[in-house]
Regions:
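Generic structural signal for short, solvent-exposed loop/turn connectors between secondary structure elements
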Residues: 21-26, 183-184, 295-298, 389, ...
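Intrinsically disordered, low-complexity peptide-like regions
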Residues: 12, 25, 34, 409, ...
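Compositionally biased, intrinsically disordered low-complexity segments enriched
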Residues: 6-8, 19, 212, 313, ...
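Small side chains
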Residues: 20-21, 28, 253, 552, ...
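Bacterial Sec-dependent N-terminal signal peptides
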Residues: 1-35
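Beta-propeller folds
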Residues: 17, 30-486, 490-505, 509-510, ...
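Serine-hydrolase catalytic core recognition
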Residues: 59, 264, 338-339, 347, ...
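Intrinsically disordered, low-complexity segments enriched in Ser/Pro/Gly/Ala and basic residues
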Residues: 6-9, 248, 711
Length: 809
C-alpha cells in the first residue's frame, strides 16, 4: 500500500470522526439525555401537600363588628387568630398547648398542640367558638363537641349540633318556613318540621304541604326537574326549590322549566356494580332546541300552608336564558341557621336578567309583583356576546351599579332605577372584575381591577377605590402582585392575599384609605425549597400579529444545566374563559413544575382570545373560529423562546392540555404536524358540535335564522376529527369513561378518524372517572411522563409493567 493510499484513508477517517462529533454536538441529536423520574417522584401531589400548607386567608368576619378570625397552617401545626382592624391587633384564639391538654382530659385520648384535629370551627354571637374533635383509634372513634369562651378561655363540652335546617330547603328570610321541590312540584314546611327533617327525614310527625300540582317530570319546579334521578326517586327525595324570596318572606319567585324536548345523553359506568350501570341525563348540544322557561310569583297564605301563583310574562327572545338576581350576602348572613337567598330588589319588585340564545342581547329587567309587569331597565347589545355581573343596588334601591363591556373594556356605570344613566364611575382601558363593597355613608366603592398599571402584567388584579361621584381610581394595595381581596361589609377594611407565580404567597390587612394596617401571614414554603423547588420564570412574547403582548411562565427542571439542550412542552388551555397561564403562585403544579422535572422545559402562555380579563377585543378574538384561533400564537411564542434561549430545542416540541386544552393540543399537532412532535390530550372537547350548547354557542357563535316568523338556530364549527389525517407526530388521547361534562364520544370520534386515516396513536381510558380523573390522576401523570420521556427525551420507562414511583408514594 502506497503512502498516498495511507494518507487518503487517514483523511477519510478524520472526516468521518469530525462529522460524528458535529452530529453529537447538534441540538436535538446531541448528548444522551436521561429522564429524571426520581425528581418528578419527589414532587407528587401527595408529597407537595406534606410540604405546603396555608397559602391564603379566608377572613371570617364577625357579625356585629369589623373583626374577623382565620386559621393558618404551617409545618408547626394550625393556629387560629382574631384580628381587630380598628385597633390593628392580631390575637391568638387558643393557647394550643393548653387546649390540647384540656381536650385530652375531656376525651381520655392523648393530643398535642401540633396535631389537634379541630373541625367545624364556628363563631357564635361574636363571643364563643364551637368545634368538634374526633378521637380514638380507627375502629373506635368518637366525636366530642366543645364550646370555648373567648373572653375567659373556658372550655366546655356541649351536645353535638346538627344543621338546624336541611340544606334542600329554601328557607324564608324570617326563618319561619321553607320551600322545597319533590316530584317536580313545590312543597312547604314550617320551621318545626324543617328542624325535625334536619335530624331525621323519616320522622312521622313531619308535616308538609303541597304548593303546586301542575309540575310533571321534565316540566316542573326545582332542581329535581333536571337531575338524572329516576322518576320514582324524584317523588321521594327532597330537592332545592331554586327560588328567591322577597325580604318580607311573603312572596317568592321561581322558574318552571320545560325540558321535555331536550334529548338524553348517557354514560356507562362499567366498574360501579355487578352489572354496568347506565347513567342518563339531559344534555343540550349546539343548534338543538332549548328548554322553555316560565316565570312565576308565589304569594304565601297567612297560615304558610299554601300559596297562590301567578305567571309573569317575561318572554322576549326564543330559547332565552333567564336568571333571577339574588341580593348579595353579608357577613351577618353567615351566622344564620340557613342559607339566606333574597331576591335583588325590595318587597314591591325584583330584578331578573334575560338574554337571547345567541347571547348578543341582554336586558336587565325589574318585575313588579303587584302588576306582574316586566320593565326593561338596562339593555346591552353586542355583535359577539354580552357578559354581565350581578348588579349592586345603592340608595335604598334607587340607583344601580352596573358592570358593562360596551366600550370594549369592563367598566362600572351608575344608573337610576328607571334606567337613566347618571355617570360612568370608571372609564378606561382596563378591566374591572367585580365590586368588592360599597360605603354609601362615605361615598365610595371598592373594586377589583386589572390592566390599570400599564407597566405590569395586565392579568395582575388589584384593589381600587373610586368615589360614587366619579373620579380617578385610587390603588390601595401593593404593586406588581396578583391580589385577591375580601372586604368587610362596610367596605372600611379588606384582606389582601397576594403573590406571583415567582413570589411566595402572603397576606396583608388594609384600610379603605390604602393604609397597610398589618402584614398577617407569609406562606411557609421552606420544606418545598429544601426538597429542591425553584420558582418558575415569567416572560413576555409577542402574538403572531407581532403587536399583541402575551404573558407566560417557564418551568425548568430543578437540576437545570444551562449548557444542556432540553425539549420544550407547552401546557395549554385556549380559553376563552381562562388561560392555562398561572399569574399567582399555586401548589397545583403537577402539569407544569412537576412535569418539567422529567427533563423538559415546560411553559404556559396566553393567546389572543384566551382570557376575559383583558380587552373585549382580546377576549373575543376566537369568536367564529373556536378550533384554530389560539394555535398560531402558541407556536410563535415557542419559536420566540427558542430563539431567545439556546437551551431550548425547537426540534423536540410537545404540547399538552386538559378539557379545552385537550381539544387545543390535538388541534395543534394536527394543524402544525411538522412543529409539534408529541401531544398528550386529556378529556378534550374535540367535536364542539356535541359539547354543551352554552359554552360552544357562546364562544363560537350560533346563527339565529328567522323564516316566516319561525326562529331556528344553526351551528357550524370546525372539529379535530376533520383534520385527523394530518397526524405525523405522536398523540396520546386520554378520557374518563363516565365523563358527563365532555362526553367520551368527543375522543372516540377522533379515534375513529385516526383509524380510518390509517394512523398509529395511543389511547388511555380511565375507568369510572369523570372529567377530572379523580383518584387516577397520579396514574395518569406517570403515563403522560412516560410518553414525553419516550418521544421528546428518548429515555422512558414506558415499557416496564410496574410504575414503581406510585408504589413509593
Amino acid at each position: 500500500m502506497t503512502e498516498q493510499t495511507y494518507s487518503l484513508i487517514f483523511m477519510r477517517k478524520n472526516f468521518v470522526l469530525a462529522c460524528a462529533a458535529l452530529l453529537l454536538c447538534a441540538p436535538g441529536f446531541a448528548q444522551t439525555q436521561k429522564a429524571n423520574y426520581a425528581l418528578a417522584e419527589r414532587f407528587s401531589a401527595k408529597r407537595v401537600n406534606q410540604m405546603v400548607f396555608s397559602t391564603q386567608i379566608t377572613p371570617n368576619w364577625f357579625r356585629d363588628s369589623d373583626k374577623f378570625w382565620y386559621s393558618w397552617r404551617t409545618p408547626q401545626g394550625t393556629r387560629y387568630y382574631i384580628v381587630d382592624p380598628v385597633k390593628g391587633t392580631r390575637t391568638e384564639v387558643f393557647d394550643m398547648d393548653r387546649l390540647a391538654m384540656q381536650v385530652t382530659e375531656f376525651v381520655r385520648y392523648p393530643f398535642e398542640a401540633k396535631h389537634l384535629p379541630i373541625r367545624d370551627l364556628r363563631l357564635k354571637d361574636d363571643k364563643e367558638f364551637t368545634f368538634s374533635i374526633i378521637s380514638g383509634l380507627k375502629n373506635d372513634r368518637d366525636t366530642t363537641c366543645f364550646r370555648y369562651e373567648i373572653a375567659t378561655a373556658r372550655l366546655d363540652t356541649v351536645a353535638r349540633e346538627k344543621d338546624k335546617y336541611p340544606r334542600w330547603a329554601s328557607v324564608a328570610p324570617n326563618g319561619e318556613f321553607g320551600v322545597f321541590a319533590k316530584g317536580s312540584n313545590l312543597w312547604v314546611m314550617d320551621s318545626t318540621s324543617l328542624r325535625k327533617a334536619a335530624k331525621d327525614e323519616k320522622d312521622s310527625t313531619i308535616v308538609e304541604h303541597r304548593l303546586t300540582t301542575d309540575g310533571i317530570r321534565q316540566f316542573g319546579y326545582g332542581y329535581g326537574n333536571y337531575s338524572g334521578d329516576t322518576e320514582a326517586d324524584s317523588t321521594k327525595r327532597h330537592y332545592p326549590g331554586e327560588l328567591v324570596w322577597s325580604p318580607d318572606s311573603k312572596r317568592f319567585a321561581t322558574m318552571k322549566w320545560d325540558t321535555r324536548k331536550l334529548d338524553d345523553l348517557w354514560v356507562i359506568n362499567s366498574v360501579s356494580d355487578k352489572r354496568p350501570k347506565l347513567e342518563s341525563y339531559k344534555y343540550q348540544m349546539p343548534g338543538e332546541p332549548g328548554p322553555k322557561g316560565y316565570l312565576y310569583i308565589f304569594t304565601m297564605n297567612d297560615g304558610r300552608t299554601g300559596a297562590s301563583a301567578r305567571q309573569v310574562k317575561s318572554q322576549a327572545f326564543k330559547d332565552q336564558e333567564v336568571s333571577l338576581q339574588s341580593a348579595r350576602r353579608t357577613a351577618k348572613d353567615n351566622y344564620l341557621d340557613y342559607w339566606k337567598n333574597e331576591w335583588l330588589g325590595d318587597n314591591t319588585g325584583f330584578y331578573m336578567v334575560r338574554q337571547s340564545r345567541d347571547l348578543k342581547r341582554l336586558d336587565l329587567c325589574r318585575v313588579d309583583v303587584d302588576s306582574d309587569s316586566t320593565k326593561t331597565i338596562i339593555s346591552e347589545r353586542e355583535r359577539t356576546y354580552v357578559e354581565y355581573r350581578t348588579p349592586f343596588l345603592i340608595g335604598g334601591g334607587k340607583q344601580i351599579l352596573h358592570w358593562s363591556e360596551r366600550n370594549g373594556w369592563a367598566n362600572i356605570y351608575l344608573y337610576n332605577s328607571d334606567g337613566t344613566l347618571v355617570r360612568n364611575l370608571t372609564e378606561g382601558a382596563f378591566h374591572v372584575e367585580d365590586i368588592l363593597g360599597v360605603n354609601e355613608k362615605e361615598g365610595y366603592i371598592l373594586l377589583s381591577a386589572c390592566g390599570v398599571n400599564k407597566d405590569e402584567n395586565p392579568y395582575q388584579m388589584h384593589t381600587f377605590r373610586v368615589p360614587l361621584t366619579g373620579g380617578a381610581l385610587q390603588q390601595l394595595d401593593m404593586n406588581d402582585m396578583d391580589v385577591l381581596s375580601t372586604a368587610s361589609d362596610d367596605a372600611k377594611f379588606f384582606v389582601a392575599n397576594y403573590s406571583r407565580v415567582d413570589w411566595t404567597p402572603a397576606v396583608a390587612l388594609f384600610s379603605a384609605t390604602g393604609k397597610r394596617i398589618a402584614d398577617l401571614e407569609t406562606a411557609d414554603l421552606s420544606l418545598l425549597f429544601e426538597a429542591g423547588y425553584k420558582f418558575p420564570e415569567r416572560f413576555k412574547v409577542k402574538a403572531a400579529d407581532g403587536v399583541t403582548d402575551l404573558y407566560g411562565a417557564m418551568y425548568k427542571p430543578y437540576d437545570f444545566d444551562s449548557t444542556k439542550v432540553y425539549p420544550i412542552c407547552d401546557y395549554v388551555y385556549p380559553g376563552p374563559q381562562v388561560e392555562a397561564n398561572n399569574i399567582s403562585w399555586s401548589r397545583g403544579f403537577t402539569r407544569t413544575d412537576r412535569l418539567a422535572q422529567i427533563g423538559m422545559i415546560v411553559i404556559t402562555v396566553g393567546n389572543r382570545g384566551g382570557h376575559p380579563n383583558r380587552s373585549k377585543w382580546y377576549h373575543n378574538y376566537g369568536y367564529g373560529n373556536l378550533r384554530d384561533y389560539g394555535l398560531e400564537d402558541q407556536k410563535y411564542a415557542i419559536q420566540q423562546l427558542g430563539a431567545r434561549h439556546p437551551f431550548i430545542d425547537l426540534d423536540r416540541v410537545g404540547i399538552h392540555g386538559h378539557s379545552g386544552g385537550g381539544f387545543m393540543s390535538t388541534a395543534a399537532i394536527l394543524k402544525y404536524p411538522d412543529f409539534f412532535k408529541a401531544a398528550v390530550s386529556c378529556a378534550g372537547n374535540h367535536d364542539n358540535s356535541i359539547y354543551n350548547r352554552w359554552w360552544s354557542e357562546q364562544h363560537h357563535g350560533v346563527l339565529e335564522k328567522i323564516d316566516k316568523g319561525d326562529t331556528t338556530f344553526v351551528y357550524s364549527i370546525q372539529t379535530n376529527p376533520e383534520i385527523a389525517s394530518n397526524l405525523k407526530g405522536h398523540l396520546m388521547l386520554v378520557h374518563g369513561d363516565i365523563d358527563n361534562n365532555v362526553h367520551p364520544a368527543n375522543t372516540i370520534r377522533v379515534v375513529n378518524a385516526l383509524i380510518r386515516a390509517n394512523k398509529r396513536f395511543d389511547m388511555l381510558i380511565l375507568p369510572g372517572q369523570r372529567h377530572g380523573f379523580g383518584d387516577m390522576n397520579e396514574y395518569f401523570f406517570w403515563r403522560m411522563a412516560d410518553y414525553y420521556a419516550e418521544w421528546l427525551i428518548g429515555d422512558s420507562e414506558r415499557w416496564k409493567p410496574d410504575i414503581t414511583q406510585m408504589n413509593n408514594d
